[in-house]
Amino acid sequence: PNLLAAWWTTLDDPQLSSLIERAVAGNLNLKTAQSRLRESRARRSMAEGRLFPTLNASGSATSRRTDTNVGFDSHGEVYSAGFDAGWELDLFGGVRRSVEAAEADLTAGEEDLRDVLVSLLAETALNYVELRTFQSRLAAAEASLATQEASYELTLWRSQAGLDDELAMYQARYNLENTRSQVPSLRSGLSEAMNRLAVLLGETPGNLHAELAEPRAVPLPPERIAVGVPADTLRRRPDVRRAERELAAQTARVGVAMANLYPQLTLNGSIGLETTSLRDPLSARTWSISGGPRITLPLFDRTIRPNIEVQSALQEQALIRYEAAVLTCLEEVENALVAYGQELQRRENLREAMEAAQSAAMLAQYKYQAGLTDFGNVLEAERSLLSFQDQLRQSDGAVTSNVIRLYKALGGGWTPMTAVAATQGPAEPL
């Protein structure tokens, strides 16, 4: 489990680990999830507040003056102050069920934060691998350009010396320019990968170009990967855990709706004082004290039962979403495992094909220089070699990317001790 929680360390790339730390600290989607979690905490506190009595204080000052037409003229001030208290007795559990719903919403928010974290870690690693793959492909293309330029110079010399016709020279030139035309698209893809990575880190596109300009090899995963058992996967996946908590919240809301069928009992009380003098508030005073229960019984309300049906339907939908999340989880794990295994086999086949293409290219070049074959064979061998080199480098990236997707499907990137306190900043993935 600890290895799964910090799966990117298995790739043994310190720069990737550094980028992931920066992404956790600066990603805007993660900060949004933290803000939603703070909202859920506040809503839970609001729901819990209904379990306790309320107490309010009030005060007023009034100036009174009689009309002179009455026969005398008088004026004065009246001051009043008081306290009002109320407490809804939760006889049928409506308030408690609303607290349960808010608590489930809060835990769903925690799982949502973890889900965003898991996706962020995977997306950061995937973009980093794509970046290194583009660098590797670009290096292979540039190396092939050097070889093809030498071939072109050779055909040009042989053509000028009358040892060959111009067809070989034009074929070499065509091959050279065709390879050269692939370089701009590779550089464009490399730049786009850097920019996407910068945005994931919460930085301005272009900020990482200097930092990541030096080419490095694509990080490769270990030969053996432990994936655990399906039951463990279901327990780890934040999206499955979130769907379960959303189902619990909606189940509680059904209870809230059903509680509206029954009477509500509230205890109210108030105490007040009215006086004409602030200097001596106990003189010329009027005290008032009141209190007692209030019961509200729904005799005719045609919205209560339809609301129960609405909440029950929403509960059914939440259950279906939970079941779908479980199936999606199992599907993604199975697909990732198959993709990883098949790409390993494909990479091995490509490696053997590239080795054969290297031998063919060397032999064709030797025979051409010796005048034993025409340049068409050299041209075909160089094309095949470049193609297999490019495919092999793409396959290296695909193997690592499939491992990353597998770790994401397994819910890797957090532990049960992961801090999700929104007020304490981003959750640490370790």
Identify the residue ranges that each predicted region occupies:
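Sec/SRP-type N-terminal targeting helices
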Residues: K31-T32, E48-G49, L89-L117, A143, ...
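Outer membrane beta-barrel translocator domains of Type V secretion systems
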Residues: N56-E88, G94-D105, G109-D112
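Periplasmic alpha-helical coiled-coil/stalk elements that build and connect Gram-negative outer-membrane
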Residues: V95, A104, E111-V229, A339, ...
